Amino acid sequence: MSVIDSSEETRIPVSREGLLKVTEIFYSLQGEARDAGRPTVFIRLTGCPLRCVYCDSEYAFYGGEWQNIDQIMEQVASYQTPYVCVTGGEPLAQKRCQDLLNRLCETGYRVSLETSGAMDVSQVDERISRVLDIKTPGSGETGRNLWSNLDVLSEHDQVKFVLCSRADYDWAMAEIRKRGLEQKLDILLSPAWGQVEPADLAQWVLNDHLNVRVQLQLHKLLWGDVPGK
């Protein structure tokens, strides 16, 4: 297991006027959520206030390069695809993230935002598909869930539960039913890589007649746990 740097600097990068701290911008197939399989440009912003046990992008906690929005947009345009995913880390931890999201929408891109669920999403442009990661007990960060976010989501958005165990699944199922999420928007259940067998999760969902999607991380099936894919 890697050692996670929990210093404040890696949690939320110090702001610089007009700039965003970027870990990487890359082109790959979307591996998760509604657009899985689509060629997509990923903008991975640096820093995250959470430390989930199953995190597969710890390298985004530190480092990165300060860039202005014009520089980011130029790189995105070079890949010639209409699909863009802004991810992290926790992208909303950076103040200028909203400016980037707005610029992407105004330029005509189809944009998704992958967020931890611990930051307020109410001000995110409604043209963006918000993919909210609700933290299960196995993540070690359940107490950071900002449940009020669910009140502002629409059928255009998605919620995701990453499951580390059967206990996580039972917890997620209880929350889904208690909050009426099945009738509101797409729900994604994803087995934590190497911790829950995908076939087991599939059978649990079938047994319980849940109106959800079982989500496997396509990029990991294709390339393994490799950054930039």
Feature map (PLM): residue ranges:
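Flexible, acidic/Gly-rich N-terminal and inter-domain linker regions that tether
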Residues: M1-T46, L50-Y54, L206-G224
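Conserved Radical SAM active-site core
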Residues: S15, L20-E24, P39-F42, T46, ...
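Generic structural signal for well-ordered alpha-helical scaffold segments
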Residues: Q30, M73-A77, R177
